[in-house]
């Protein structure tokens, strides 16, 4: 078995318990203290240099690739320059979590406590909090805007220019920066910051060279006591690491090592997530083709190296605060690999490497990387068939994004046509042009639509906290028509959207000022040309997509109110509001709840009554969010604007915890609907009706992604004819209905329930949570229950 060694490597990594690692935090503190008088770009560069030159490194016995993020595989480094607050508060709680458990030694606790005084009121969390205007304090205090993750971490959502990295090496970027620095006129005030930015690039490039050279020495040292076969391999690793990533790659092995070094180091520099591989099959294929033709590689050896790379990918880890885990359950890093789609000149982009990536991802059967296939009307039929075969393995991959809607949407927002054809997935379902896209394309305020509706109904006051969130537009109990509610919704949603923009802008400015990411900026066009890091507006394109939660709950709630209260008169506004306040308890509570659930139209059934109501309500958000530029607007990038997106990841569970009962019959504290998917078991007319309902959303304006989860029983796809039905369904959804995205959990309810009772029997069970997959056993009970509760469709 040519993959036997990689299978052992996989098992070793999966068996490793994830620990909190203080090493990076200690080294970062040392650098920040030593260079505290330096401009921030230089301080950040020296920090990365300190870490890369002194951190623990190792090469696993089974690995053909060198490079590690932490002191041991799957350990989570700490980033005190972003935050240390939640870490200190949860030091004794990491091992006691319901999900996303981390282990920690007493020595690590003491190391973290020892550096705490340096970071008190001296990191992103503190500075961002201080910058927030008083007008938005009520939303932060109550957790209405889900900014916990944003204030604790960077948020990448991009793919750097790996094609140029392989073509020119880091020395190509270094030389361009050197030329740009030499051309500066230092009498121009703007040149001073550029001068220091270019110097910071020289520092980080040198640091990466040193990091790679350390692996050269380590590989040679390990070779001295290795078996003859392993010695040969270690010496090859040493030779490769002596060349890349500083020099251009000339073989597939060099290309993989170069990409991995950068992918890993970017996640040492910043604790942002969704740092993605981009269009892997496009920029890697020339090296694969050349090596296959020369005999240097075989298809088997290429797949083995790919499986090695994907296992290395799962070694990257990130610890989040307990509050943040509610919206990012399963410790996901969202590292996306995109294959398929079309070339920049509009031809089918599927190539032999596309198939090998599919094969290798199936072989490793891991939740990372997140595999996305770009669908288009001319997609190779055999490739589509292979995608479904991999999907049938039941680990939630690949997901499909649709060129037929995404490319025109990008062009409508100002993206050049050839760049639009070159997009990739960069996290869950979000998309961007790799190597040209700004640092924060995803807003993180999580607009909770059902809660906005409750605030609207309660005259602008949040029922959960009792605090005023919006101006007074009237209480639902006093409304005489559905039009009154719609008018109040319009005004309340627009007000809260403006508030979310204030919060996001404040935190964006803090990110820009406090934690510039030098290596990431250097590898993204056109930061070097502009002399600006990403957060200053260095990228060619820069957009932010707001995220919305509970779309189906909003639809079903509006439909119930309009039909049962204002059209049929079966409920008075006072009766409905009382039922919501009491969580459907009391004299008529259960009766009213049953009425709301069973007697009103539901989103997900191709029912225009419910579908048109949510479209109308959603259009208000689309219109309002587009009015507000981001902090990079007018500073260089094309765009600088906002648009909507439904990639709510697992925030539907966390946001549901703080949302009281809603008029769709949902109980207080229970999960909201995720993405644009229907509420659990409300979609009663099969998958085609679901797809038709989703297609009625303003998909062309939801450029940030329209996330649709579906679940089917494995027996549904057991026969060849069933697979052909699914392919026909997907083609209809994408070609005729212009769907944006779809992904499947191919797993039975019975399997999931058994995994809850007997987790030891299902260690390898992987499920699609939202726009990403995770091991079922590491999820919290609430998230597991949410996945189990999803509608199971047949074809």
Task: Describe the predicted segments one by one.
Residues 213, 217-220, 559, 792:
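Short amphipathic alpha-helical segments enriched in leucine
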Residues 199-211:
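Extended non-globular scaffold/tether segments
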Residues 4-198, 229-236, 244-795:
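Conserved catalytic cores of very large enzyme subunits
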Residues 181, 209, 216, 220-223, ...:
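Heptad-repeat amphipathic alpha-helical coiled-coil interaction surface used
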């Amino acid at each position: 078995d040519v993959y036997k060694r990689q299978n052992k490597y996989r098992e070793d990594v999966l068996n490793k318990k994830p620990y909190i690692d203080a090493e990076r935090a200690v080294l970062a503190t040392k650098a920040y203290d030593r260079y505290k008088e330096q401009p921030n770009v230089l301080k950040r560069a020296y920090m990365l240099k300190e870490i890369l030159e002194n951190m623990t490194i190792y090469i696993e016995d089974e690995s053909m690739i060198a490079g590690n993020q932490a002191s041991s595989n799957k350990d989570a480094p700490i980033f005190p320059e972003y935050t240390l607050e939640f870490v200190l508060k949860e030091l004794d709680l990491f091992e006691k979590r319901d999900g996303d458990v981390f282990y920690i030694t007493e020595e690590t606790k003491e190391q973290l406590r020892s550096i705490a005084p340096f970071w008190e009121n001296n990191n992103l969390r503190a500075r961002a909090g201080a910058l927030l205007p008083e007008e938005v304090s009520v939303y932060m205090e109550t957790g209405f805007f889900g900014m916990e993750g944003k204030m604790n971490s960077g948020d990448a959502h991009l793919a750097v220019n790996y094609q140029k990295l392989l073509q020119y090496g880091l020395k190509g970027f270094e030389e361009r920066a050197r030329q740009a620095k030499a051309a500066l006129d230092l009498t121009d005030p703007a040149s001073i910051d550029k001068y220091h930015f270019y110097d910071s690039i020289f520092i980080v490039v040198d640091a990466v060279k040193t990091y790679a050279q350390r692996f050269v020495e380590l590989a040679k040292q390990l070779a001295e006591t290795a078996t003859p076969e392993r010695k040969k391999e270690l010496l090859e690793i040493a030779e490769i690491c002596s060349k890349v990533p500083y020099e251009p790659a000339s073989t597939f092995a060099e290309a993989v090592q170069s990409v991995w070094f950068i992918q890993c180091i970017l996640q040492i520099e910043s604790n942002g997530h969704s740092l993605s591989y981009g269009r892997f099959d496009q920029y890697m294929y020339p090296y694969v083709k050349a090596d296959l033709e020369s005999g240097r590689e075989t298809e088997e050896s290429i797949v083995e190296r790919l499986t090695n790379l994907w296992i290395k990918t799962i070694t990257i880890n990130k610890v989040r605060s307990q509050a943040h885990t509610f919206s990012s359950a399963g410790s996901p890093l969202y590292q996306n690999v995109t294959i398929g789609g079309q070339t920049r000149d509009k031809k089918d982009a599927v190539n032999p490497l596309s198939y090998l990536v599919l094969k290798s991802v199936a072989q490793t059967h891991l939740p990372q990387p997140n595999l996305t296939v770009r669908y288009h009307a001319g997609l190779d039929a055999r490739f589509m068939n292979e995608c479904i075969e991999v999907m049938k393995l039941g680990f939630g991959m690949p997901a499909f994004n649709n060129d037929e809607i995404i490319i025109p949407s990008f062009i409508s927002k100002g993206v050049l046509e050839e760049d639009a054809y070159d997009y990739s997935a960069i996290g869950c379902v979000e998309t961007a042009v790799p190597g040209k896209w700004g640092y924060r394309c995803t807003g993180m305020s999580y607009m909770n639509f059902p809660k906005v509706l409750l605030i609207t109904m309660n005259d602008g006051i949040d029922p959960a906290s009792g605090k005023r969130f919006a101006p007074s537009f009237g209480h639902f109990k006093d409304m005489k028509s559905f039009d009154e509610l719609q008018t109040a919704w319009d005004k309340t949603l627009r007000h809260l959207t403006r508030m979310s923009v204030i919060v996001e802008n404040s935190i964006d400015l803090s990110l820009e000022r406090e934690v510039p990411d030098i290596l990431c900026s250097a590898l993204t066009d056109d930061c070097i040309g502009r002399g600006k890091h990403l957060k200053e507006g260095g990228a060619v394109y820069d957009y932010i997509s707001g995220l919305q939660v509970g779309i189906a709950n909003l639809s079903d709630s509006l439909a119930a109110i309009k039909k049962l209260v204002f059209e049929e008169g079966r409920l008075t506004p006072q009766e409905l509001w009382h039922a919501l306040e009491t969580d459907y308890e009391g004299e008529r509570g259960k009766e009213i709840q049953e009425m709301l659930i069973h007697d009103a139209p539901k989103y997900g059934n191709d029912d225009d009554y419910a579908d048109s109501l949510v479209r109308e309500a959603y259009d208000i958000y689309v219109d309002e969010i587009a009015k507000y530029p981001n902090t990079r607007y007018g500073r260089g990038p094309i765009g600088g604007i906002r648009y909507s997106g439904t990639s709510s990841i697992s925030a539907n569970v966390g946001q549901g915890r703080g949302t009281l009962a809603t008029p769709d019959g949902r109980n207080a504290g229970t999960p909201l609907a995720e993405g644009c998917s229907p509420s659990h078991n409300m979609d009663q007319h099969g998958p085609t009706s679901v797809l038709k309902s989703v297609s009625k959303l303003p998909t062309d304006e939801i450029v940030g992604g329209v996330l649709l989860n579906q679940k089917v029983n494995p027996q549904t796809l057991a026969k060849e004819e069933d697979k052909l039905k699914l392919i026909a369904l997907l083609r209809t959804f994408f070609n005729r209905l212009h769907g944006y995205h779809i992904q499947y959990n191919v797993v039975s309810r019975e399997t999931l329930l058994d995994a809850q009772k007997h987790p030891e029997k299902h260690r390898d069970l992987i499920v699609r949570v939202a726009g990403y997959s995770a091991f079922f056993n590491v999820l919290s009970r609430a998230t597991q229950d949410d996945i189990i509760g999803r509608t199971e469709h047949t074809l």
